[in-house]
A protein has these predicted regions:
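Alpha-helical transmembrane bundles and membrane-interface segments of multipass inner-membrane proteins
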Residues: 1-124
Length: 124
């Protein structure tokens, strides 16, 4: 779509949106650790009983695995979405999944905190 987005080929050795260039093995280890912990929590912890939390973690994990596959086999992540209407980093669908899942997770946690605070307040 001219003036909005274009497809390009970019090799990203950093993390989401080309941040922190380099450190391939560190990012692989970190991604594996976080992914495994999320999956364990999804199936052993509270994640299984709450659809919002389960969805948020699942979207984060799916994006992380997508980028992890590229990083392990290629040494970099292939980014291809370039928003031309704003000066922004080139990114991919997995980056979108991690970002949207994280936003959803933060919203869930805020909602959960406020719900607990309201529960603790005495009724007038």
């Amino acid at each position: 779509i001219k003036g909005v987005v274009e497809f390009v080929y970019a090799q990203n050795t950093g993390v989401a949106f080309s941040l922190f260039d380099g450190g391939r093995w560190f990012f692989i280890a970190l991604t594996l650790a976080v992914t495994v912990l999320c999956i364990i929590y999804m199936y052993k912890g509270k994640g299984q009983s709450n659809l919002w939390l389960f969805w948020s973690l699942g979207v984060i994990v799916s994006g992380a695995i997508g980028n992890l596959i590229d990083r392990i086999f290629l040494g970099y992540v292939i980014d291809f979405i370039n928003p031309t209407f704003v000066n922004f980093a080139v990114f991919n669908i997995a980056d979108c999944a991690v970002t949207l899942g994280t936003i959803s997770l933060m919203a869930y946690l805020l909602f959960d905190i406020f719900k607990k605070e309201n529960k603790d307040e005495p009724a007038n």
